[in-house]
Structures are given as C-alpha cells and as structure tokens.
From Swiss-Prot:
Keywords: Cytoplasm, Methyltransferase, S-adenosyl-L-methionine, Transferase, tRNA processing
Organism of derivation: Pseudomonas aeruginosa (strain UCBPP-PA14)
NCBIfam families recorded: PRK00026.1, trmD
Listed GO CC annotations: cytosol
Stated name of the protein: tRNA (guanine-N(1)-)-methyltransferase
GO molecular function, one term: tRNA (guanine(37)-N1)-methyltransferase activity
Length: 252
C-alpha cells in the first residue's frame, strides 16, 4: 500500500497554506492523494464577536498569549477529521527540537500530523502540557508565527513520500540525506563566462561521475559544514576521496 500522509494545521492564517496546497511538489502530492492538508482556524471557536484568540499574559510583560479554548476547539475538530489515524500533535516552537533530515525521516513515518502554529508571544503553556506530543523548531531565530515553520516541515516530509517526486532518486540525492551537503550541479550551456562544465560530467562514465559527485559532496561539507562530518563515519573510499580533495585544494 502506498504511503500517505494526513496533515491538519491549526492556524489563524489558514490562507497562507495555499502556498503548500496550490504550488510545487506538495500540490502535486495533494492531487495524487499522497498528502491530505486541512486547516482549522481557532477564531472559529471563539465566543465573542471580535473572535478574540489572545489575551494579556499573567505576570505582565509585552505581547499577548494565545488562549487555550479556541486552540482546543480547533484541535478537537482536527482530531475528529483524522478519523482512525493516530495523529501526532506538534507545536512549532523556538524551544523545540531542531528539525534535521533525520528528524524529517522520523516524521515521514507517521500516518497523521496535527501542526499547531502559534502567534504573538506564544500559546498558553497548559495547552502544550495537555495536548502537544512534540515541539519542533526550524532554527535559532525568531519568526512572527508558526505558519512558515509548519510549511517547511510539510514540504520536507512530503518529499520523502514515495511517488511525490518526479524522479525516484531525487530525495535520496538531496543534501543531508546521507549526512553530506549536495554536490554542484550543471546544465547547458557547457561554457558560461569562460567557466566550463567539469569534463567528468561530460564523459558518460557513470562510475567516474559517481566518485566525482561523492568527492565534491565530501569536500563541500568539509569546507562549509565540518560539524556534519564529526557525526558521520566515513568509509575507506570516502576518506581517500576527501584527502585527495583537500590535497588538490591546498595545491591550487
């Protein structure tokens, strides 16, 4: 049976998620039935005419905090829509576990996700304690809300659904999939601004091309994200290719 993913999003700006449902690979996954994406707006679950979803924080301080009841109403309907699927509830938060490709692979194993996109200064901590299974962050910086991180997560996970990409090998060759940055890529013309496409890529020798791409990925990772190599065990071939890359770089 094909792997399919159901995603529910709780957000006061559901329109933002048209960027996911209407464009690119994620849109194609929706049309293929691989990805189901539905949004619930907490404002619908308010009881005042202003549809208030936030209030002042206890203890004072700047900003507002999202109230529990509207979030609970939206979450309850999202859970019901998930049907018999076991949905993991995720809050996008700067305090969460940082999203990496390894984490994306973990999330891609789930059958259903409910993503809580906060706003303002955040959401009432008691909602998190009562309802949230995991908190995830996309980096050590501050955004205006959880919608963009939620879209990043959905896009990254969708790429791993079988059939979502046009080429079966595309996801496996992405940066970080094997713990390395990606190698350089080239297309026509062969010469641009006196810079030629590397001859090995024009050779037609698949083994030479494979080794060149692996060496470039190793070298680029060593130059730009050496920390990734600290957590990765290099094979004998990889050690030789990286040593050769460094030697050629030092000689140039």
């Amino acid at each position: 049976m094909d792997k399919r993913l159901w995603v529910g999003v709780v957000s006061i700006f559901p329109e933002m998620f048209r960027a996911i449902s209407d464009y690119g690979i994620t849109s194609r996954a929706v049309k293929q039935g691989l990805l189901t994406l539905t949004c619930w707006n907490p404002r619908v679950y308010t009881e005042d005419r202003h549809q208030t979803v936030d209030d002042r924080p206890f203890g004072g301080g700047p900003g507002m905090v999202m109230k529990i009841k509207p979030l609970e109403g939206a979450l309850a309907d999202a859970r019901q829509a998930a049907g018999g699927r076991k949905a993991k509830v995720i809050y996008l938060s700067p305090q969460g576990r940082q999203l990496t490709q390894a984490g994306v692979r973990e999330l891609a194993e789930e059958e259903a996700l409910i993503l809580i996109a906060g706003r303002y200064e955040g959401i009432d901590e008691r909602f998190i304690e009562e309802h949230v299974d995991e908190e995830w962050s996309i980096g050590d910086y501050v955004l205006s809300g959880g919608e963009l991180p939620a879209m990043v997560l959905v896009d990254a996970v969708t790429r791993l659904l079988p059939g979502a990409l046009g080429h079966a090998d595309s996801a496996e060759e992405d940066s970080f999939t094997d713990g390395l940055l990606d190698c350089p890529h080239y297309t026509r013309p062969e010469v641009y601004a006196d810079k030629r496409v590397p001859e090995v890529l024009l050779s037609g020798n698949h083994e030479h091309i494979r080794r060149w791409r692996l060496q470039q990925a190793l070298g680029r990772t060593w130059e730009r994200r050496a920390d990734l190599l600290d957590s990765r065990s290099l094979s004998g071939e990889e050690q030789k290719l990286l040593a050769e890359y460094i030697r050629q770089r030092d000689d140039s």
